[in-house]
């Protein structure tokens, strides 16, 4: 068999309505983390948040809490699995 016969399934692209959580490693080393509070809230890493809108490389996320919606880079998000 050749290497091309083994394909790793690609994750589904994140889109409007997707449930997500923040990838801690990607977020903590980002410009967005530097511009925010030094200690991010734990709920963003636990999820789920819902993507409301996608524009370019960013997604607007709404959390199931009484907090404002936030814009985060899509590469900082990962799909939420129960």
From Swiss-Prot:
It is a peripheral membrane protein. The keyword tRNA processing does not apply. Keywords: Membrane, NAD, NADP, Plastoquinone, Quinone, Thylakoid, Translocase, Transport. One of its GO terms (molecular function) is quinone binding. It is found in: Cellular thylakoid membrane. It holds the Pfam family NdhO. Its EC number is 7.1.1.-. One of its GO terms (cellular component) is plasma membrane-derived thylakoid membrane. It catalyses: a plastoquinone + NADH + (n+1) H(+)(in) = a plastoquinol + NAD(+) + n H(+)(out); a plastoquinone + NADPH + (n+1) H(+)(in) = a plastoquinol + NADP(+) + n H(+)(out). InterPro entries: NdhO. NDH-1 can be composed of about 15 different subunits; different subcomplexes with different compositions have been identified which probably have different functions. Belongs to the complex I NdhO subunit family. This is NAD(P)H-quinone oxidoreductase subunit O. It comes from Prochlorococcus marinus (strain MIT 9211). The gene is ndhO.
């Amino acid at each position: 068999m050749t290497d091309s016969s083994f394909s790793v399934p690609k994750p589904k692209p994140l889109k409007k309505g997707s449930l997500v959580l923040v990838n801690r490693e990607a977020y903590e080393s980002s410009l967005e983390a530097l511009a925010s509070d030094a200690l991010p809230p734990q709920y963003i890493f636990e999820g789920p948040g819902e993507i409301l809108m996608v524009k370019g490389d960013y997604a607007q996320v709404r959390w199931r809490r009484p907090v404002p919606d936030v814009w985060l880079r899509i590469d900082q998000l990962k799909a939420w699995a129960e």
